[in-house]
């Protein structure tokens, strides 16, 4: 049984063949595959962001890999946040097997093995180039959102940054910020008279929030040399975009660190990149796997900042794709900014799952060819319901799609393969060694050390003056008391005498038959 020709005609109209696009796959309708790789995302619309969602094991990571490698092939640099370590294989060519051959045949795709230029990055420096950023580059507003500070605490942090700017104190890492806070809440408090001052309670909150961030590994992230975001925009000698892979297996239980880096990176790109508006191809595309780690437990201020950056960075030619199990993992404000949807199968085992399924189905455009809710539960592995923004900015009707196989390896590099690539990477060597140049912490320590000798000299001078001073003279006309008189006048002598007297009087009164009255109880 052949696929309904009306479905194919509608797909050809939605995805015209003359458009430069990222090929996704062939249309599927009532279990029949169209045999033509028609469905794709226009390259000029990749900066309109997207969502890749679906239950575990439905093929989300392979879809991510498929889109990323085609972007690289078109000269577009790519950034991948790899939580599970599944996509490092993009750096080497895939191997054909029966499943690959069958999928290529079903979709009418001419599959060829290929690897792509890749660089590996790390927030801990263990499996890639060490990523770092300075506290100064964050600035007080962004850092306040990361630390989840209230308005008063945020204003104090801004005050501290202003003070450091005025005094030439560099804030490179968290130890610099801690040193300044401790100084200004102690011996340097007088320096703040022109800035408004700050309470020790507020300083305590800031220090505690910093400790919490450090416990997630931020002490490794803040510092120098700072990662140059231009390294994410590299194109290889043969014109292919570089795929930068951030290995996150060792920090997947530290979402605050991941969120901190992501927000800094997007905000810095937005600040540094020029406005380009609508372009033929994006300047850079991000893929954030396991996106719920970014949004889980994030503060309202941080979510607002992420939503704002995602909304605005489109005009810089940068696209952002989130990969997660369910659309409900992404806040509605962010979800509304995602123009492309590649929705793999959803499972409805519980009432909550059923509710999420209905909500996901309602977000798709209307279509006369599919029952969207039923289709979402019947998709096979490597199939997805796809709707994208056309070059005119209008969402296409959703089409069930059988995805083509990636041309790179569908699996991670071995440890030996990864180490070989790291050892030959100039980028890894560039960021391998931390730089600890003079900054606020060292400058304040030097200032305290310079003040210490002055204090010692002052103390020595006081001692010398006391030694030179003449001894006090005895009062005229009266000889000094003898040693015996001094002993009798001492407090101890008076105490001993009183004890002896009370003992003698007690014995005398007892012999006369007189009882001593009990002492009165003190009333309070």
Where are these regions (language model features)?
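Conserved ATP-driven motor cores of ASCE-family P-loop NTPases powering translocation/secretion/packaging/pilus
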Residues: 2-3, 66-68, 91-110, 308-394
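Accessory regions of macromolecular translocation/handling assemblies
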Residues: 1-103, 133, 144, 271-276, ...
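P-loop NTPase motor domains
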Residues: 68-78, 85-308, 334, 378-379, ...
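Generic beta-strand/beta-sheet core signal
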Residues: 44, 53-55, 81, 121-123, ...
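Conserved P-loop NTPase motor module
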Residues: 1, 6-7, 11-16, 28, ...
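Hydrophobic alpha-helical scaffolding
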Residues: 57, 147-150, 196, 296-299, ...
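Flexible loop/turn segments at secondary-structure boundaries
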Residues: 48, 59, 86-88, 127-129, ...
């Amino acid at each position: 049984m052949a696929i309904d020709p009306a479905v194919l005609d509608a797909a050809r109209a939605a995805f015209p063949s003359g458009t430069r696009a990222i090929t996704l796959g062939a249309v599927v309708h009532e279990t029949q595959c169209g045999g033509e790789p028609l469905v794709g995302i226009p390259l000029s619309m990749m900066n309109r962001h997207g969502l890749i969602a679906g239950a575990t094991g439905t093929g989300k990571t392979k879809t991510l890999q498929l889109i990323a490698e085609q972007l690289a092939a078109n000269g577009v640099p790519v950034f991948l946040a790899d939580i599970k370590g599944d996509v490092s294989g993009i750096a080497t060519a895939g191997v054909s097997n029966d499943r690959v051959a069958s999928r290529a045949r079903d979709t009418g795709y001419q599959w060829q093995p290929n690897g792509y230029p890749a660089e590996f990055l790390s927030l801990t420096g263990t499996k890639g180039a060490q990523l770092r950023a300075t506290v100064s580059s964050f600035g007080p507003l962004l850092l306040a959102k990361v630390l989840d500070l209230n308005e008063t605490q945020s204003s104090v942090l801004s005050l501290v940054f202003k003070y450091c700017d005025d005094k030439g104190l560099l804030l490179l890492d968290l130890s610099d910020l801690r040193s300044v806070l401790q100084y200004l809440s102690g011996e340097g408090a007088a320096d703040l008279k022109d800035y408004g001052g700050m309470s020790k309670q507020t300083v305590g909150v800031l220090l505690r929030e910093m400790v919490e961030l450090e416990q997630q590994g931020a002490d490794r992230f803040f510092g120098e040399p700072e990662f140059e975001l231009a390294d994410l925009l590299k194109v290889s000698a043969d014109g292919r975009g570089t795929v930068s892979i951030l290995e996150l297996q060792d920090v997947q239980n530290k979402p605050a660190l991941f969120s901190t880096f992501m927000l800094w990176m997007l905000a810095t790109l937005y600040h540094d990149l020029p406005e380009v508006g609508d372009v033929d191809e994006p300047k850079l595309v991000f893929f954030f796997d396991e996106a719920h780690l970014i949004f889980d437990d994030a503060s309202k201020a941080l979510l607002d900042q992420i939503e704002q950056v995602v909304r605005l960075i489109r005009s810089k030619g940068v696209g952002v794709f989130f990969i997660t199990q369910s659309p409900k993992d992404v806040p509605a404000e962010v979800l509304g900014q995602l123009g492309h949807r590649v929705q793999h199968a959803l499972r409805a085992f519980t009432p909550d799952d059923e509710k999420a399924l209905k909500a996901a189905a309602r977000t798709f455009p209307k279509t006369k060819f599919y029952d969207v809710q039923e289709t979402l539960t019947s998709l096979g592995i490597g199939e997805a319901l796809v709707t994208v923004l056309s070059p005119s900015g209008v969402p296409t009707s959703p089409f069930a799609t059988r995805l083509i196989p990636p041309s790179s390896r569908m699996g991670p590099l071995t440890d030996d393969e990864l180490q070989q690539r790291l050892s030959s990477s100039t980028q890894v060597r560039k960021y391998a060694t931390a730089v600890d140049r003079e900054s606020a912490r060292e400058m304040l320590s030097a200032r305290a050390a310079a003040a210490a000798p002055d204090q010692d000299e002052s103390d020595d001078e006081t001692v010398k003056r006391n030694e030179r001073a003449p001894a006090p003279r005895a009062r005229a006309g009266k000889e000094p008391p003898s040693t015996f008189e001094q002993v009798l006048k001492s407090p101890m002598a008076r105490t001993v005498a009183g004890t002896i007297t009370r003992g003698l009087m007690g014995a005398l009164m007892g012999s006369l038959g007189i009882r001593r009255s009990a002492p009165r109880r003190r009333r309070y």
